[in-house]
Amino acid sequence: RPDVGIVGAKLIFEDNTIQHAGVIIGFGGVAGHAFIGQDRDDNGYFSRIISVQDLSAVTAACLMVRRSVFDEVEGLNEEFKVAFNDIDFCLKVRKAGYLVVYNPYAQFYHYESKSRGQEDSADKVARFQQEIGLFGERWGELLENGDPYYNPNLTLDKADFSLKE
C-alpha cells in the first residue's frame, strides 16, 4: 500500500513475554513500548496486541521501510545517537503523510540491548538525558497533546492500557 511508510513487528523477550507491540508517545515521559512484559499470547486491551493497526511509532529493532520513504524524510537523525532515533524517524514519516503500522503476525525474539548495552554509566546517562531533551524540543507539542493513537483516559504510567486513576 502506498500510504504505508513503515511496518513494525511484534517482538518477544526470551521468557516469552512481549518486548514490543508498538510504541506509545508519552510512556515514561517520552515514549515506551505498549504491553511490555505481558504474556506473548495475551490479546491485550481491545485485542490490540493481536491486531494490525496504525500507531505513532514502532521500534527500529525490527521495521521495514521503503527506500523512497527513508530518503524522503532524510533517514534517521544522527543527533539521536542511541535513544529515540527510531521514534523520531517514525514521527517524521507520519508527518510526511504516511502510516506507521504494527503487524502482530510478524513475530520475532529480540534480545534487547544485547548489542548496545544498558544505560549504566555516567556518560550513557548524560547522553540519554540529552536525547530526552532533544526529543522534547522536536516533538514537544506531541508530548503535550498526547499520542493520537492512545486514549487520553488511559494511564501513561503502565504499559497495559489501564485507566488513569
Residue ranges and their predicted role:
Residues P2, F84, D88, D123-Q130:
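A general alpha-helical scaffold signature found inside nucleotide-binding enzyme cores
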Residues D15-N16, F27-L55, V100, G117-E165:
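C-terminal, non-catalytic tails of nucleotide-sugar-dependent glycosyltransferases
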Residues R1, L76-N77, N151-P152:
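Acidic/polar residues at beta-strand termini and the immediately following turn/coil
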Residues S47-E74, E78-Y109:
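A short, conserved alpha-helix in the catalytic core of glycosyltransferases
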Residues R1-V30, L99, Y105:
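Conserved donor NDP-sugar-binding/catalytic core segment of glycosyltransferases
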Residues Y111-K114:
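Conserved active-site-proximal loop/helix segments of enzymes involved in bacterial cell-wall
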